[in-house]
From Swiss-Prot:
Known function: Involved in cellular auxin homeostasis by regulating auxin metabolism. Regulates intracellular auxin accumulation at the endoplasmic reticulum and thus auxin availability for nuclear auxin signaling.
Xref: Pfam families: Mem_trans
Transmembrane segments annotated in the record for this chain: 9-29, 46-66, 74-94, 107-127, 143-163, 233-253, 273-293, 303-323, 341-361, 370-390
Protein name, as recorded: Protein PIN-LIKES 7
């Protein structure tokens, strides 16, 4: 496979995202006025409560069995490493560049969370279909590749709706607290850029001093922590993922809804149909937010460059090292396609679901759209270069 062929394959899912985003941006203009801010919020809630749980359940229940989970045990660890290392690098970007307070969680989340959904489902089978692919028989490669990609998508969704969800929510909560305390005057001013923001009025100092004297008991802290964990576990996308794992891993449940002779296959078909609305809706909302972001957002160029460096330079290098080390230690099956998927998980653009979270918590929506625009514009070239490197390593 030549560089130009790889560029074409890698560009297809990116171009799809950009085209649908342009449509969403047009629908949000004053000329069209179909995707107003209120409409985007309502559609976003549908994505969170209905579409995302459905796509996660449908993909997991259909493509992943108990044997697959056992055989591919390293993939959950690999995805966890991408989130852990990406989160650490994102935290360093925040510390070095000191962006606006409301962007802290967003930046860490975009550095940590890769788009393991539609991109993997398009890229992996496309690589299998090309002549000269190092992954053997085309039909076998495509079938196994789709299973790898679906499992990757489900794992990514699980991490995104627990780890990344918590990052964005915590950032939004902290920002609201700063606003309430008067430490932040407006969304466009940050503590360090405004010399008066740190100088509180006397009554504010007294209030904060009183608050500081109030000690929270250990029992209350543990209670709040457990409540927070349960809240994340019972988020609709997480429930969809858990149910998908249960149905996929339990043969008699799987046989009820999966397959031509399954008595309740209409349930799986209906859930799958609902799930197919996830990606178009998220992308349209992203495009709608982009219009407002280009008008009013002031994201530092250094922040965008920082996210791009983390996602397309540092993480892929770490990924090659992790996969090669795991292979040398005998932790991976001999299938080179499995190793390719593991490496690819480190080189993907940010997960689209982050824009859903930003909309859900009403924090940094415009900035999120601008960051996504630039990271996805760079993604085509980055994915092509890294796919070429990964294939050369595995050949």
């Amino acid at each position: 496979m030549g560089f130009l062929e790889l560029l074409e394959v890698a560009s297809m899912p990116i171009v799809q995202v950009l085209l649908i985003s342009v449509l969403g941006a047009f629908l949000a203009t004053d000329y069209c006025s179909l995707l107003s801010a209120d409409t985007r919020r309502s559609v976003n809630k549908l994505v969170f409560v209905v579409f995302t749980p459905c796509i996660m359940f449908a993909n997991l229940a259909e493509t992943v069995t108990l044997q697959d989970i056992i055989s591919w045990w390293f993939m959950p660890i690999n995805v966890g490493i991408t989130f852990l290392v990406g989160g650490i690098l994102g935290w360093l970007v925040v510390k070095l560049l000191n962006p606006k307070p409301q962007l802290h969680g967003l930046i860490i989340a975009t550095c940590a969370s890769g788009n393991m959904g539609n991109l993997m489902l398009i890229l992996v089978p496309a690589i299998c279909d090309e002549e000269g692919s190092p992954f053997g028989n085309r039909s076998v490669c495509r079938s196994i590749g789709l299973s790898y990609a679906s499992f990757s998508m489900a794992l990514g969704g699980f991490y995104i709706w627990t780890y990344s969800y918590q990052l964005v929510r915590s950032s939004a909560t902290q920002f609201r607290a700063l606003e309430a305390a008067g430490l932040v005057k407006s969304p466009n001013k940050d503590i360090d850029s405004d010399p008066h923001a740190l100088l509180l009025k006397p009554h504010q100092n007294q209030d904060l001093e009183i608050q500081g004297k109030q000690k929270v008991s250990t029992r209350t802290y543990i209670k709040d922590l457990l409540h927070q964990i349960l809240e994340e576990l019972f988020a609709p996308p997480t429930i969809g993922a858990i149910l998908g794992f249960v149905f996929g891993a339990t043969n008699w449940l799987r046989n009820l809804i999966i397959g031509e002779n399954a008595p309740l296959r209409v349930i799986q078909d209906s859930v799958k149909l609902l799930g197919e609305g996830t990606i178009p809706c998220i992308t349209l909302i992203l495009g709608g937010n982009l219009i407002q972001g280009l008008r009013s957002s002031a994201v530092k160029k250094s922040v965008i460059v920082g996210v791009i460096i983390v996602r397309y330079i540092l993480l892929p290098v770490v990924g090659v090292g992790v996969v090669q080390l795991a292979g040398n230690l005998g932790y991976l099956p001999p299938d080179p396609l499995f190793r390719y998927v593991l490496m690819l998980q480190f080189a993907l653009p940010p997960a689209m679901n982050i824009s859903t979270m930003a909309q859900l918590f009403d924090v940094a929506q415009d900035e999120c759209s601008v960051i996504f625009l630039w990271t996805y514009l760079v993604a085509s070239l980055a994915l092509t270069v890294w796919s070429t490197i990964f294939l050369s390593i595995l050949s």
